[in-house]
């Protein structure tokens, strides 16, 4: 399956002029502690992909941006990265959505996968080395199920009508080590998350489906154990083992996949390949909430990346908003969060431009210290909040933030005749309205309130595709801001992305690009 176009990414080692790796320490769900992540020359990562419907909401984005940041730290340390990601393009939820909407399940899957690709490209996520659909992996699934049947780790239920194949959960004595849940919690999550504990003929309620015998109206493929289709967990197990082997560095995904999905996919690989532990690290992202309620397809309270981008939101603002919380925490998405990220991005861009215009030895020394500190923060369990704070501190020492936000019509301040410094492309969250047209932003103080979601999109739109602004005050009280193109819009090669900047500015912009995927 085709992935998406690779973004232009600054080469970190070329930017900083050194090749000294920084030791990585990442949280491991199985041990419940931060432990060293020590790949060989080739780092190996498997991240569970989407079931292609309702793509791409911010819960998805949070997960894939997180593992993109991990990918970038591995690359900065000089590793080759073998990054594998799947698409669950044959599964019950996909069939149910297609039936609800009256469309073909394959067409729905292809359409939503295309949308996901576009969203990942817009967010600047580095594409996986291998992007594999479950359908194309069915031969690998059949091979693994056959192995599990042959070595006694699986069995066929005694049902002449639907002879499904199940994994014996006792086949691996270490089963449960990843989630560390007790039996009652396992049974609860198994029932809630696609399991069938009450299926007649099973040896144990927690035995998981490997191969579902053909049912009327469902897709099916030939196999030595009858026509049917794969279970959910065996799909990822077969893909991971095929493209990464029986043991690799990181298995990742959202925390709702810890059990049953990741527990079982690891157990299937371990039982089929005779290994004790599939991955060195099991990493999981916290869930994203809207208004304090978890975003979910069932509740329908989803915020979509494509809608934000279509409204003009700078993708870097979306990434930066997600960085405000640690990837393992439960995070709440809000209009204010996105607006704050847009203002922060504008501040950083203005600081880079200011340093570019006034480069000196002290600026270069401070920029290099910043790069070292940001790298260390991210090497410590991807601590993006700490990294963001570090860049904030650096930018705040360069740009007079009081002057930056002292705009006509903002927060009830009086209009000024002129501004003494360039201003970022967004103002603080207020009731003022922004209009974007023909490469200019106009901030209007009409005294009227605006809806929170519209205000967020407008504020975020203000920095869309921009690097810095110049401001012009008018007697009418309007402030018109010229938008200048960001580096990623100029079509530069990765090695030349920041060659137009002074050494200090290039250090900061290149670091933020290479490590965080943000375009300054």
Swiss-Prot record:
One Pfam entry name: tRNA-synt_1e
Keyword Ligase among record annotations: yes
EC code: 6.3.1.13
Binding site for Zn(2+): 48, 236, 261
Gene Ontology biological process terms, A to Z: cysteinyl-tRNA aminoacylation; mycothiol biosynthetic process
Top-rank lineage group of the source organism: Bacteria
Reported cofactor(s): Zn(2+)
Name of the protein in question: L-cysteine:1D-myo-inositol 2-amino-2-deoxy-alpha-D-glucopyranoside ligase
Lineage per the UniProt record: Bacteria, Bacillati, Actinomycetota, Actinomycetes, Mycobacteriales
């Amino acid at each position: 399956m085709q992935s998406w176009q690779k973004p232009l990414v600054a080469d970190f080692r070329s930017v900083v002029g050194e090749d000294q790796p920084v030791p990585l320490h990442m949280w491991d769900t199985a041990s419940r502690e931060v432990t060293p992540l020590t790949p060989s020359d080739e780092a190996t990562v498997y991240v569970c992909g989407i079931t292609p419907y309702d793509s791409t909401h911010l819960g998805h984005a949070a997960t894939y941006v997180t593992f993109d940041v991990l990918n970038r730290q591995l690359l900065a340390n000089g590793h080759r990265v073998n990054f594998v990601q799947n698409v669950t393009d044959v599964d019950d939820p996909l069939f149910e959505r297609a039936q609800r909407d009256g469309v073909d399940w394959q067409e729905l899957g292809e359409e939503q996968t295309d949308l996901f690709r576009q969203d990942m490209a817009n967010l600047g996520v580095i594409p996986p080395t291998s992007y594999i659909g479950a359908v194309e992996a069915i031969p690998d699934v059949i091979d693994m199920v056959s192995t599990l049947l042959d070595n006694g780790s699986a069995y066929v239920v005694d049902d002449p009508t639907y002879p499904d194949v199940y994994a014996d959960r006792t086949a691996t004595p270490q089963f449960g080590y990843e989630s560390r849940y007790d039996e009652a919690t396992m049974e609860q999550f198994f029932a809630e998350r696609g399991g069938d504990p009450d299926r007649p003929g099973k040896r144990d309620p927690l035995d998981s489906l490997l191969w579902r015998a053909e049912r009327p109206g469902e897709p099916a493929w030939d196999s030595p154990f009858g026509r049917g289709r794969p279970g959910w967990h065996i799909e990822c197990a077969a893909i991971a083992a095929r493209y990464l082997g029986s043991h690799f560095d990181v298995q990742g995904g959202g925390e709702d996949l810890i059990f049953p999905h990741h527990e079982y996919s690891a157990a299937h690989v371990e039982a089929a390949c005779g290994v004790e532990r599939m991955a060195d690290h099991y990493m999981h992202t916290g869930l994203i909430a809207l208004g304090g309620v978890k975003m979910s397809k069932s509740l329908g309270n989803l915020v979509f990346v494509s809608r934000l981008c279509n409204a003009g939101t700078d993708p870097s603002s979306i990434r930066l908003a997600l960085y405000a919380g640690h990837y393992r925490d439960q995070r709440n998405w809000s209009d204010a969060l996105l607006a704050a990220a847009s203002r922060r991005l504008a501040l950083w861009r203005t600081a880079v431009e200011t340093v570019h215009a006034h480069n000196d030895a002290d600026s270069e020394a401070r920029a290099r210290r910043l790069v070292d500190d940001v790298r260390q923060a991210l090497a410590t369990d991807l601590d993006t909040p700490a990294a963001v704070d570090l860049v904030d501190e650096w930018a705040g020492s360069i740009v007079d933030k009081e002057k930056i936000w002292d705009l006509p019509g903002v927060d009830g301040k009086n209009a000024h005749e002129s501004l003494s410094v360039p201003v970022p492309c967004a103002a603080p969250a207020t009731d003022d309205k922004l209009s974007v047209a023909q490469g200019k932003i106009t901030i209007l103080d009409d005294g009227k309130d605006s809806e929170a979601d519209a205000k967020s999109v407008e504020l975020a739109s203000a920095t869309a595709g921009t690097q810095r602004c110049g401001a012009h005050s008018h007697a009418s009280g309007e402030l018109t801001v010229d938008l200048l193109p960001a580096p990623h819009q100029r079509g530069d090669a990765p090695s030349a992305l920041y060659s137009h900047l002074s050494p200090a500015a290039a250090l900061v912009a290149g670091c933020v690009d290479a490590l965080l995927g943000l375009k300054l």
